[in-house]
A protein has these predicted regions:
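Polybasic, lysine-rich low-complexity intrinsically disordered segments
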Residues: 2-3, 7, 17
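Hydrophobic alpha-helical segments, chiefly the membrane-spanning helices
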Residues: 4, 12, 22-348
């Protein structure tokens, strides 16, 4: 009898211990989930407020320097918001995952035009200036075509492996230098409105820096904690990479362009996207490739490249006649993006 009682006691003790362990696990998991949700909210607050300060600082900087806001959008804003793509590319190349670099840039460029400009135009109708339609948007098309030609060497010779070589990287850098020269030439034009800058140049640049730090920190918090929440809810790694991670590097461009559109800073909103796309190809691809080494194209799909070119051409066609992007054009871009992304998720 004593042995039987002892066995029953041991079984009950084991069950109680297992139950306690399970409840403790759920409790800790619940706390982690709450912390992740709170940090996710903090991330979004930092993103939105950071973008707000960033746009104000960029606009004031343009007025202080007596240059057009488009130039500031194409340079300070675009290069600042493209920092995540650049960081991802450098890390990928140094770790030997060079095939990630191309996907990062192409995916970001497609998302920038179709999704970000699409969403931004829903918030406010964006007037596009003649110079942007005739010069800056065609430059985006040119850089997209250039990357496609340099990526697919076997178009011309079936025996060649698709690789973006160091020479290709130097070529894209040279094209980017020409782009910078073009920006320098148009930067001489004074701002058309003759507005007074709301802040002095020092404070304006400080706002740009503070805003950018807020955007980058907010982006990291959103991506990290959204991923943690998704994993806790048993969302697959593939779905996380196709959604949260893929959109993560473009969050700075998204919040900056949306905030700029809401403030009717159209040149900053559009310049940010055009400048980011050119920067992604000229610097994010060109510089690491020229300095570190080749980028393997691997089995990268032609459809993705042609979608990138098509998105740039679509932007030109939508703005050529009316010289603006409104809700109608925005919905067209969003619809095309949904179709393309559906293809990507299904596995194309």
């Amino acid at each position: 009898m004593k042995k039987e009682h002892r066995k029953v006691y041991e079984v009950r003790w084991y069950r109680d211990l297992s139950s306690l362990h399970h409840r403790l696990f759920l409790y800790i998991g619940g706390i982690k989930m709450i912390i992740s949700i709170l940090l996710l909210i903090v991330g979004f607050v930092l993103l939105i407020k950071g973008a707000d300060i960033f746009v104000d600082g960029a606009s004031s900087t343009a007025l202080n320097l007596k240059v057009s806001k488009m130039v500031i959008g194409l340079t300070i804003v675009a290069f600042g918001t493209s920092a995540p793509e650049f960081a991802v590319s450098i890390k990928a190349l140094l770790s030997g995952s060079s095939d990630i670099v191309l996907g990062n840039v192409v995916g970001s460029n497609i998302l920038n035009i179709l999704l970000i400009l699409g969403i931004s135009s829903l918030f406010s109708s964006m007037v596009v200036k003649d110079n942007t339609v005739k010069k800056e948007i065609p430059l985006t098309i040119l850089f997209s075509v250039l990357l496609t030609i340099l990526s697919f060497d076997n178009i011309f010779d079936k025996n060649i492996t698709n690789v973006i070589t160091r020479t290709d990287g130097i070529v894209t850098l040279l094209f980017f230098i020409v782009f910078i020269y073009y920006l320098a030439s148009i930067a001489k034009n004074n701002n058309e409105e003759n507005e007074e800058a709301p802040y002095k140049i020092g404070k304006s640049l400080l706002f740009v820096l503070i805003g950018l730090v807020g955007i980058v920190a907010g982006s990291n918090l959103v991506v990290d904690n959204a991923s943690a929440i998704a994993k806790a809810l048993n969302v697959s790694e593939k779905m996380i990479s196709l959604t949260i991670v893929a959109f993560g590097t473009s969050l700075p461009e998204l919040v900056t362009s949306v905030q700029a559109a809401r403030k009717h800073e159209n040149d900053i909103a559009i310049g940010n996207i055009i400048g980011s796309n050119i920067f992604n190809i000229g610097i994010v691809i060109g510089l690491p490739c020229a300095l570190i080494g080749n980028i393997n194209v691997g089995t990268f799909n032609y459809i993705d490249m042609f979608t990138m070119i098509g998105a740039a051409i679509l932007l030109f066609l939508l703005t050529f006649k009316k010289r603006k992007l409104d809700k109608g054009e925005g919905l067209i871009m969003l619809l095309i993006f949904i179709v393309y992304y559906g293809y990507v998720i299904i596995g194309g």
